Amino acid sequence: MADYNTLYQQGLYLSPDQQDLLLAALSSNNPTQKQQTVTHNSEANQNLNHTPGHASSGSFSVSPPSGLDGSVNQSTTFGYEDSPYLDLNPDFDLDFLGNESLIGDLPPSLPSTEDYEPGDKRKDIDGQVNDKEDSGKKRRESDEKAAKKPGRKPLTSEPTSKRKAQNRAAQRAFRERKEKHLKDLEAKVEELQKASDNANQENGLLRAQVERLQLELKEYRKRLSWVTSTSGLSPVNAIPGAYSKGMYGLNNNEFMFDFPKFGDLPGSHLFTNTQTSKSNQNKAKDNPTATPRSEAQVPGVLNRNDLKISSPNGLSNGPSPAKSTPSGQTPNSQTSTRPGSGTLNGAVDNNGAARGYQVNSSYSASTKQATHDTPSSDSPSSSSDSHQSQLLSSNGTSPEPSLHSPAVKATESSTPHACTYTTINGEESFCAQLSMACGNINNPIPAVRQNSESASNTPSHANSSDKALGLDFFAQQNGGQFDPVLFGDWREPQDAILSQDFGTFFDDAFPLPDLGSPSHNFSEATKQPAAPKKDLIAEIDSKLDEDEEVVPGEDKSQMLTCNKIWDRLQSMEKFRNGEIDVDNLCSELRTKARCSEGGVVVNQKDVEDIMGRVK
């Protein structure tokens, strides 16, 4: 058997055509058919292409000399019996070649096509290696290893598949990095959003607190103005230097003086009574026409005699300031002094008393009387100058206190704040009188209220011989006029915490429990339906947007200034004919006046109402 295999390997040789056929057979799916085709083709080709010098296994059955090698043919000493193939059984050879088709597929242990490699590596007759055979062998090996199904399959070891795998790995890593980056950004956005929400909330709280403080500040200012306007005598009234010289002496600048401090006021009458008597004599000469009217009694008069009745020293109606002077004035001088000092008109004396006693209302009546006559001018000529200048200028429109001008003026016999509206300065005089409803920076209390309050604080109003005023304290406080400003018209109709509307404030702040108590039922029965609450924040914003506040809650476009009111007054025919009581009209306008940064203003509706009554 071994000899047969060796002989078979030595005698097997395939030409290029045979190799092509062999490759075609190997590519088929049936390995049995491949081996049969190779066997039959090799036998046919060896028989057809048999050449001398080549031995083939098929030549043994035909004729022994055809299968011998060249060396065997050359030696004539060997016969058929000496042939090296004598041990070979021809039957075995034929049976072996046919066994493949009889048995079927060869087992894996049998020699495969790889066993033919030594024969394939033999050189050609020309001594050259067949490259085509080697390339075919490589293709055959690759086909047998991988091809279990028809067609070629891509190899994972190729560079293209490696690049694809690398690309997939890179894309996967990029997606992971991108997702991680997005998560980090989302976390940072959430943190920033939380910080922004916290900052916005804190800013909102601070803004609300600032607005609440601003609202409280406004309410405190309103309350301060309300308290100072309704109190009897504020500490500002006790300081004579608090009056504004620029406001209370429009055309009488020559009568501006500096006076002692507040602590020097009680004893000032000890040194100035002589000057008082001299000035009273000069006033008696300058005003001889005031004597017939001095004895007249008009409703609302506060004469000097009334002041003397209330004197704690028990003085009668007859004594005059001359009795307290060390120079010993005669009774004639007393009677001549009376027309100038104790004036006639009730409203005028009310003003005079206010001017004389507003500074020192806490002292005795004698001290007040001395204080009233004390602050006079330094010379008799100045008193006459005062009389002349007040006839030509707006004396009463700017109510000077007795500390800034001669004590009692002859021109005050007409009205409390008399004005000369027929002169060139008529408009200025009217505006000055109307502006008395407002104060200034140095003295925030309006001059009209100041004078009326100081007049009501005098001890003579209860013992006055005039019975028209009666014992009405509130009428005395406001100069006999009802002023609705004192009772809350100036306030805004808002449900503020610090508003002066204490009824609604306590009802809202301290609601009674619903226990069925009689007081609770009564409060609910008497309680009016509550107005809808306003948006305080919106109101505060609207107030902050306003450049100039005329008065809280008032429309600036509906407010008329003094000049516009004067123009309307001049357009009236009764005013040109002198048929209108301008002083009364001015006092009515003062009750409706409001204070603003630009000066006193009056609501257009109030102006039309007052002027309509005059017409």
Swiss-Prot record:
One Pfam family name is bZIP_1
Q: Residue numbers of motif Nuclear export signal?
A: 580-587
Q: Which UniProt keywords apply?
A: Cytoplasm, Disulfide bond, DNA-binding, Nucleus, Oxidation, Transcription, Transcription regulation
Q: Region Leucine-zipper: which residues?
A: 185-192
Q: Which SUPFAM superfamilies match?
A: Leucine zipper domain (SSF57959), YAP1 redox domain (SSF111430)
Report the PTM annotation: Depending on the oxidative stress inducing agent, yap1 can undergo two distinct conformational changes, both involving disulfide bond formation, and both masking the nuclear export signal, thus abolishing nuclear export.
Q: Give the CC-aspect GO terms.
A: cytoplasm; nucleus; transcription regulator complex
Q: Where is this motif: Bipartite nuclear localization signal?
A: 35-42, 68-75
Q: Where is this region: c-CRD?
A: 562-595
Segments of this protein annotated with the region Basic motif: 162-183
Between which residues do disulfide bridges form?
Answer: C562-C586, C562-C595, C586-C595
Describe the task this protein carries out.
Transcription activator involved in oxidative stress response and redox homeostasis. Regulates the transcription of genes encoding antioxidant enzymes and components of the cellular thiol-reducing pathways, including thioredoxin peroxidase (aspF3), cytochrome peroxidase, and the protein AFUA_3G00730, which appears to belong to the glutathione S-transferase family. Proteins of the protein degradation pathway are also regulated by yap1, as well the p-nitroreductase family protein AFUA_5G09910. May be involved in antifungal resistance to voriconazole.
Output this protein's name: AP-1-like transcription factor yap1
Its ancestry begins with: Eukaryota, Fungi, Dikarya, Ascomycota, Pezizomycotina
Q: What gene makes this protein?
A: yap1
